[in-house]
Amino acid sequence: MANGGGGGGGSSGGGGGGGGGGSGLRMSSNIHASHLSLDASSSSSSSSSSSSSSSSSSSSSVHEPKMDALIIPVTMEVPCDSRGQRMWWAFLASSMVTFFGGLFIILLWRTLKYLWTVCCHCGGKAKEAQKINNGSSQADGTLKPVDEKEEAVAAEVGWMTSVKDWAGVMISAQTLTGRVLVVLVFALSIGALVIYFIDSSNPIESCQNFYKDFTLQIDMAFNVFFLLYFGLRFIAANDKLWFWLEVNSVVDFFTVPPVFVSVYLNRSWLGLRFLRALRLIQFSEILQFLNILKTSNSIKLVNLLSIFISTWLTAAGFIHLVENSGDPWENFQNNQALTYWECVYLLMVTMSTVGYGDVYAKTTLGRLFMVFFILGGLAMFASYVPEIIELIGNRKKYGGSYSAVSGRKHIVVCGHITLESVSNFLKDFLHKDRDDVNVEIVFLHNISPNLELEALFKRHFTQVEFYQGSVLNPHDLARVKIESADACLILANKYCADPDAEDASNIMRVISIKNYHPKIRIITQMLQYHNKAHLLNIPSWNWKEGDDAICLAELKLGFIAQSCLAQGLSTMLANLFSMRSFIKIEEDTWQKYYLEGVSNEMYTEYLSSAFVGLSFPTVCELCFVKLKLLMIAIEYKSANRESRILINPGNHLKIQEGTLGFFIASDAKEVKRAFFYCKACHDDITDPKRIKKCGCKRLEDEQPSTLSPKKKQRNGGMRNSPNSSPKLMRHDPLLIPGNDQIDNMDSNVKKYDSTGMFHWCAPKEIEKVILTRSEAAMTVLSGHVVVCIFGDVSSALIGLRNLVMPLRASNFHYHELKHIVFVGSIEYLKREWETLHNFPKVSILPGTPLSRADLRAVNINLCDMCVILSANQNNIDDTSLQDKECILASLNIKSMQFDDSIGVLQANSQGFTPPGMDRSSPDNSPVHGMLRQPSITTGVNIPIITELVNDTNVQFLDQDDDDDPDTELYLTQPFACGTAFAVSVLDSLMSATYFNDNILTLIRTLVTGGATPELEALIAEENALRGGYSTPQTLANRDRCRVAQLALLDGPFADLGDGGCYGDLFCKALKTYNMLCFGIYRLRDAHLSTPSQCTKRYVITNPPYEFELVPTDLIFCLMQFDHNAGQSRASLSHSSHSSQSSSKKSSSVHSIPSTANRQNRPKSRESRDKQKYVQEERL
């Protein structure tokens, strides 16, 4: 068998030298017999292809040449010469000579250049001096030869620079050519690496014919390209030395020259071609050039993977080389046959420190390399692999892009995304009472959701999707398809410690979204009223196109202010704008009637053409009696097509075609009756459920109509100026103005602000409104509003202007304004005073709401309402303690005791009575805000409204209730009674505004007292109200509706109070006085047969027609402005229109005989009261 191999070797060597070759090969066959079978097939093919002797010599025996070739070590096939000499050193030497030769030349050039610079340093200085000395003769042309020489040098430098710049452009990724070249080089490097993987199955060194080996030809073409690219890089390099030592350069040194050597020697050496794997490190750069990688996480992930894999493959290539070759000092005798992929496996188990032992290094070089590699490899494995797994695990969970569903709209919700905010939003947005919610909700937040929030998303997976990202990043906005979204809703953190910072964050979100897509509709929550002005600075912000800012401070304090005028109104309004399911209770308890009202919400619908030409009260009565709907407002188009929302406008206004009505109903389907109603078809129908689309309506629908389904839902194109009133004079016979000059006095006196919407006075210094405790006690305040405020110099501002403005609305006469007394820290109130100094009848008592002496000084037992606010709530981390100050103050007031005799004495003394006010008994007024008990001897009976941050803290306000701590806020007794208010109830306004943008306008009209966009722009400029002269235009703005409470105990409706029907009261009040009733404020225990001492009341919203009334009920109503209330209060009609805020003191004729005896008392006191209050208004 050995002799046959020798013959083959001789044949390959050529001619008669075959025998010698065979004998030489037989010696090595005795040593490596165990490895010979691996190369049998390859040696035979190589032998036959390279033979140049006679055919008989090459084909004498087929079996023996194979066996003779198998004697050669696995590192080489049949040698390409007669001696079987290895040539690996030639390949390695080519790389070493190239590297060190080039390095030597670079260093030599630098040395010579340095020496030249040092030697010529003095000569250079002499030339510079010569230039300076000859500077004056330059104009005469004496330096022309020098100039020509300098130009030649400059041209040479310019040519070299141009070549260098051209080479830099060619390899730069800034240009298209450069990017193509860079990507091509990387792709060819990977191709060369693949060729290495293919060749690794062959012996380390083998004979190859360049003209017949296809892979060698491809590899040669690749390396020629690498050589050209290397030249470009060398030319473009600024520092040639550092370029020579770069990793990519070293890769080229050890891979390119050996290919040329292999062509020359007609043999191949696998060698260091594995270094091409180091090119994988640039993989992330290539993907960035192609704009495939854009996020930091993806770039980091690809970087880690490329470094890890390139290091792994390169190290495996080195082990493969040394293990298959053996140690040179051992004459390559200790080699072992390992495939490249076995080496890859070996390196992985080595890095992971597992080390199974099935594959291991035998050579000294291999083991020495493993010793050093295991140190770095272990560190890399331990750090890179966990990070890679973490990036892969987190990357795809909430990444990706939103895929829009055809025929289905989607909205984007961002901002403060937490379990509480999202659950409240989804509960209201996806409520079953909403008609056909075919909207998908896409949440975008930069923090991944926790487990609870994730579970919430999964429960609503059919309509909710979450994506991790930021609205400040245009890439993330593109992912959620913001350009095709129906709207973008931004939630605010109501409990943040710095409200201004939170508002600034949301304003930046608005700017980012509008910058990306100016036409997107945005609804955002704002915490502070003064920050709304910054939204006006955004060019693409347009409230006419549906953009809205829901200011929580403005609405929260507006709700509370309305409760000062009609206690319980805050609860009723909050329930109307929230979606609540109907909860049926069979037992005859107060909860039964309360929950029946809670199920009512606010809806809009276009009115049927059957109502065209009818007056508003007529349509309102018809809707209530026949359709079982309560209409409280309409959208009115004036002659110039300007749209306004009018609340209970009165009988002078006629319904137009296409009028939008605002209804209170239990669901959206009921409101459709107002659109489907037809007098011809439905006039005799008694069951409102049978009022459906009739044949007449179908004929109308076939004709062109201006009412689109989208308008019915959102009415986006008919945005009106919020709170603006029609500039029309009332023509109701009961409301004919007598002599306006009596009430408005001299038109040259500024009594109202420039818009005519609020009472105004000249700015006052805070020192002039501060009362000491003794001054407050001597003043004997009565029928006023006490505002207990907790705050200090470092507290965030609440924005008390939003509380005062509704109480100073111009649709009150001056004598009807309630005096406001602030009790709190003077340091805090000084910070708020700049926004309050233009309002009349405001006083400050420095102190603390927890001091009973301060509370007694302001006669808290005689106040119409006590408001408890805190500016320190968000500075406490423990949510259960956030409301501690308000709760303590409330409990403190409720535990106070008062002497009735002192109260009666004070009420009849020369105490506080603003000019023109009647001191009549409040208990017999037909219209008043809160039916005061004959006397208050305990603090429990004092009307209080407490602001809470944490809903669960409501359980601490009433010690005698049985509310469960887990009960929702709207189901608790304090909220139902109107004695507690939490800002969380305003969350529902986000979804309500989205579905109907007129809803926010309506609620702001109701609670702010008449704030308009013009007024907001003015406040944004000056941060204060500007006084204006009384003109017919501004005075016409006073003619608007307001909320009041109607007492049934006595007065024109006393006959209905005892067992009458609510529907009869509704119709009588509407027909007789244009008063629109919409709810009842009833004693909690009124349903009990036995009399109770409990004075707590609860709210009943929109009771049915047949609902039975009791004498102690107070009726919520929308009252017209009474022009004559400022002149005369001697008629019944005027008393029915007097304000509930002034009814406790004046503005009505009462039925008790003692009234006449008291009529002269205000006149006798007027001069004394003016000294303290009227004079303040004129300062």
UniProtKB/Swiss-Prot annotation:
Residue stretches making up the RCK N-terminal domain: 408-550, 782-926
Protein residues bound to Mg(2+): E440, Q463, E465
Location of the region described as Disordered in the Swiss-Prot/TrEMBL record: 1-62, 702-730, 1129-1179
Sequence motif Calcium bowl, residues: 946-968
Disulfide bridge partners, by residue number: none
Source domain of life: Eukaryota
UniProt-listed Gene3D superfamilies: 1.10.287.70, NAD(P)-binding Rossmann-like Domain
Assembly notes: Homotetramer; which constitutes the calcium-activated potassium channel. Interacts with beta subunits KCNMB1, KCNMB2, KCNMB3 and KCNMB4. Interacts with gamma subunits LRRC26, LRRC38, LRRC52 and LRRC55. Beta and gamma subunits are accessory, and modulate its activity. Interacts with RAB11B.
Something else known: The protein was initially thought to contain two functionally distinct parts: The core channel (from the N-terminus to the S9 segment) that mediates the channel activity, and the cytoplasmic tail (from the S9 segment to the C-terminus) that mediates the calcium sensing. The situation is however more complex, since the core channel contains binding sites for Ca(2+) and Mg(2+).
Name the record gives this protein: Calcium-activated potassium channel subunit alpha-1
Organism of provenance: Oryctolagus cuniculus
